[in-house]
Amino acid sequence: MRIRKNWLWVAVAVAVIAGGIVTAVLLRKSAPPDAVRLLPESDAVFYVNLAPIRLFTDLGKNLPKERDPQYEEFVRQTGFEFERDLDRAAFAIHYGVASTGKQAETRYSEVLQGRFDSTRVGNYLRKLATRVEPYQGYDIYIIPVEDRTLRVALLGVGIAAASNTDSADIIHGMIDRYRRAALPFVGPSLVSQYYRRVPLGSIVWTIARPPAAGGAEDHGELLVPGGWSGLLPPDGVVIASARPLNEVRLRADVITQSEAGAQKFKQQADVYLALFKSLEFSMDTGGPDQDVKAAFDSLEVHQEKQEVVLTAKVPYAFFKKVLSEPPVEFGPAAPKSGDQQAPPASSGAKAPNPKQR
């Protein structure tokens, strides 16, 4: 009888421990990435996981032979190359407010995770800094960059935080959250409210409130690439993501304040989409690019009550070209051969080729 009771208590203890582990795993799974949880309050959050991107592309494999001298010196002194050694990055975007005689300035706070030598990086930052401020056992490097102040802190092995906001409170808060081991549900309120809607497996995503027209510097490409940002309702929320499956699935949910607002945005997006599909897409090598064409042909827009959803399926080959070749060129679709008009006989010159640069 005593043996049975002992086994019963063992079984209960195992069940409790297993339940705790499962709960912790589920909480961790539904929580945003560690780097995001360190970020301060902001108007937009952008996250990218570069590790899987390197598997699908040549990023970091064919490093450029010629680079900016200042960046080359950074690499020489630190041994860190962003293309090769940066694994994950999270950005908080602060739009700023315009004041009398002063334009609104966008500021950024970021957390970078990768492989770097803390001693070498620390020595490099110390050379650039005008002073080093201690805070809770961490060194904050104060670095002047143009007319702003950049604060950088090395938080631990392979992780750094930086911010160019006016107040030091931002970087202090990032350090404090790191010291608390980045609890699962801390971080920007935008992320707490909307991260659950980011598709599982997304390696690039953003959650943002679009800026008011003329309220801050242009930074819309972090929200929805390709020029769509100018259409976004300023009182809405955008959740955009990219995740790799058979191809890269792109999705952007635009949440508006009303069905009428969603309908208006969809109508604008439909016009914009029709324009995109009328363009001819080519690489510098000349001729239509089928991967680019397939990506834009897959673009779809549909409305769900107060929301508008934009989706696209992009071939992996497209991203390989983007990261290894010259930029994609956009231009009006070339007229069919039967519709082309011959140049006047008296001109004495050949008709220009619209694909030539």
State the predicted function of each range.
Residues 1-16:
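N-terminal Sec-pathway targeting helices
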Residues 25-43:
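Ser/Thr/Pro/Gly-rich low-complexity linker/stalk segments immediately outside membranes or between
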Residues 27-28, 50-52, 254-357:
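C-terminal functional regions that serve as terminal interaction/effector modules
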Residues 35-39, 46-50, 55-57:
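N-terminal, charge-rich interaction modules
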Residues 46, 82-186, 252-255, 302, ...:
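Single conserved position on a long alpha-helix in the C-terminal lobe of the eukaryotic protein kinase
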Residues 53-89, 132-246, 262, 275-282, ...:
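An internal, short helix-loop-strand segment that often contains or flanks glycine-aspartate motifs
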Residues 55-57, 117-123, 259-266:
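Short, conserved charged micro-motifs
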